[in-house]
Curated annotation (Swiss-Prot):
Belongs to the ABC transporter superfamily. Heme (hemin) importer (TC 3.A.1.14.5) family. The keyword Nucleotidyltransferase does not apply. Its EC number is 7.6.2.-. Part of the ABC transporter complex HmuTUV involved in hemin import. Responsible for energy coupling to the transport system. This is Hemin import ATP-binding protein HmuV. It is found in: Cell inner membrane. Residues 2-238 form the ABC transporter domain. It is a peripheral membrane protein. One of its GO terms (molecular function) is ATP hydrolysis activity. Keywords: ATP-binding, Cell inner membrane, Cell membrane, Membrane, Nucleotide-binding, Translocase, Transport. The complex is composed of two ATP-binding proteins (HmuV), two transmembrane proteins (HmuU) and a solute-binding protein (HmuT). GO terms for cellular component: plasma membrane. PROSITE patterns: ABC_TRANSPORTER_1, ABC_TRANSPORTER_2, HMUV.
Length: 256
């Protein structure tokens, strides 16, 4: 479980998170949605311990984040940021193996190979990371996070992803979310991601959180949260919300 209680964070007189309280029990994919500047990435950084709130508290497995050591926290949660630049010309395999650093032990070769296959990175293994496309880099970073959290015996872990599909083609978007579902169901992973694609959230998320001006304005199942009234008010766009015939999830369409 991860929880946030009364999070407040201001920068240059602007509240980026405004009295945010949330509890995610785990065993689900959570999507945080909202327009640009809503506070989504700021909230994610607070939930992961990278940014201390001005007031309020975050807990992971009922323990305050500021009471975790950096090493132990890294074994229980992993974070993909929007941009992951490398200053040196590491190979893809070297970047992925960096995920084992908190464990102070090398990962088994067969497990690394398994994770690279899960993330469709095998063909990239010997490539220079800095020469990859944005989508290829996102796949490599996901593999690094899985190597960081992977244990022989599955145990509860948290995976935080900030716009993980921003550079992915449609095939790899589908592949990513199918993999995340597999990790939730088979490896006791819990996933929290910031997204801009409303239809991906509607199709794959178990829970949706809507943010506006630093506040959480809705939190619940996609079919309850992603309504035409709520989305029109939030984004100011002309849209129609239909029902996906395949799974009855919301289907958001831009009007002409």
């Amino acid at each position: 479980m991860i929880s946030a209680q009364n999070l407040v964070y201001s920068l240059q007189g602007r509240r980026l998170t405004d009295n945010v309280s949330l509890t995610f029990p785990g065993g689900e994919i959570v999507a945080i949605l909202g327009p640009n500047g809503a506070g989504k990435s700021t909230l994610l950084r607070q939930l992961t311990g990278y940014l201390q709130p001005d007031s309020g508290e975050c807990r992971l497995f009922n323990k305050p984040l500021n009471e975790w050591s950096i090493t132990e926290l890294a074994k229980h949660r992993a974070v993909m940021r929007q941009n992951s630049h490398m200053a040196f010309p590491f190979s893809v395999q070297e970047v992925i193996q960096m995920g084992r650093h908190p464990h102070r032990t090398g990962n088994q070769d067969n497990e690394t190979a398994q994770i690279m296959a899960l993330c469709d990175c095998q063909a990239l293994a010997n490539r220079n990371y800095r020469q990859l496309s944005g989508g290829e880099q996102q796949r490599v970073q996901l593999a690094r996070l899985l190597v960081q959290l992977w244990e022989p015996t599955p145990s509860p872990k948290w995976l935080f992803l900030d716009e993980p599909t921003s550079a992915l083609d449609i095939h790899h978007q589908q592949h990513l979310f199918r993999l995340l579902r597999q990790l939730v169901h088979e490896r006791q992973f819990n996933v929290c991601c910031v997204l801009h694609d409303l239809n991906l959230a509607a199709r794959y998320a178990d829970r949706v959180v809507l943010m506006q001006k630093g506040k959480v304005i809705a939190n619940g199942k996609p079919q309850d949260v992603l309504t035409q009234q709520a989305l029109t008010m939030l984004y100011g766009a002309d849209i129609t919300v239909l029902k996906d015939p395949a799974n009855h999830s919301p289907l958001i369409v831009l009007d002409h």
